[in-house]
Amino acid sequence: MKLDSGIYSEAQRVVRTPKFRYIMLGLVGAAVVPTAYMRRGYTVPAHSLDNINGVDTTKASVMGTEQRAAMTKGKSLQEMMDDDEVTYLMFSSIM
């Protein structure tokens, strides 16, 4: 099955129109960029040198902490996370 060459040229024409460019710019500006900045702050929190120097990283100190599970059966998403995390999760699902 061959594609009609008119379909290809029509798709190129639509992509080159200013309306499509503004839609893509709006998508990047409104969804992708804020999500990237939020993820950076969420996964790599800011630490001061005083806090880092006071951390005990021995195996004994780590073994005493409780294990947290990502998902547990029988609980809804709202019960497991606070409102900020749910908002972040829904916002990052745009990507």
Curated annotation (Swiss-Prot):
The keyword Transmembrane applies. The chain crosses the membrane at residues 20-38. It comes from the Eukaryota. It is a single-pass membrane protein. Keywords: Membrane, Mitochondrion, Transmembrane, Transmembrane helix. The keyword Nucleotide-binding does not apply. GO terms for cellular component: endoplasmic reticulum; mitochondrial membrane; mitochondrion. It is found in: Mitochondrion membrane. Disulfide bonds: none annotated. Induction: Abundant in stationary phase (G0) cells. mRNA levels rapidly decrease upon exit from G0. This is Stationary phase gene 1 protein.
